[in-house]
């Protein structure tokens, strides 16, 4: 039985990385090749959390972070699909991949209009999570 992975992807490609590698990093493709070739693992999808989005001060800024998250997971899925296409075996990986993004600010920036514009270009199934959204009133407005 294969272990299914939700691969962390970093949207920022800088020293403030929260988790994962940026799809722009040269090692990213190499890591995917190892994971995808292994008989012990499969990729369920890609996960991204723009921790820096908590510093955003407007809906527009939060939307920019959301766009960066979506670009990162979409680029990761595109790279994985190209690696799988070059493999000489039948894929046992979850395609379309789950593309999981979000933090409280970026989840709130995901308006129906924004989602409609973005969904047409995604290489997987979108999942938007709200970080600590369920307790955001207590966390974001202490006192």
Enumerate the language-model features and the residues they cover.
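Active-site loop/helix belt of alpha/beta enzymes
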Residues: 3-143
């Amino acid at each position: 039985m294969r272990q299914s992975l939700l691969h962390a992807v970093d949207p920022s490609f800088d020293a403030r990385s929260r988790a994962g590698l940026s799809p722009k990093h040269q090692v990213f493709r190499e890591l995917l090749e190892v994971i995808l070739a292994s008989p012990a693992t499969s990729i369920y999808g890609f996960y991204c959390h723009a921790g820096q989005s908590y510093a955003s001060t407007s809906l527009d800024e939060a939307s920019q972070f959301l766009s960066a998250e979506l670009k990162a997971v979409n680029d990761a899925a595109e790279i994985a699909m190209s690696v799988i296409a070059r493999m000489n075996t039948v894929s046992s990986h979850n395609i379309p991949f789950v593309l999981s993004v979000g933090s409280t600010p970026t989840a709130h920036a995901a308006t129906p209009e924004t989602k409609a514009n973005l969904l047409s270009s995604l290489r997987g199934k979108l999942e938007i999570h709200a970080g600590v959204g369920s307790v955001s009133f207590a966390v974001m407005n202490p006192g």
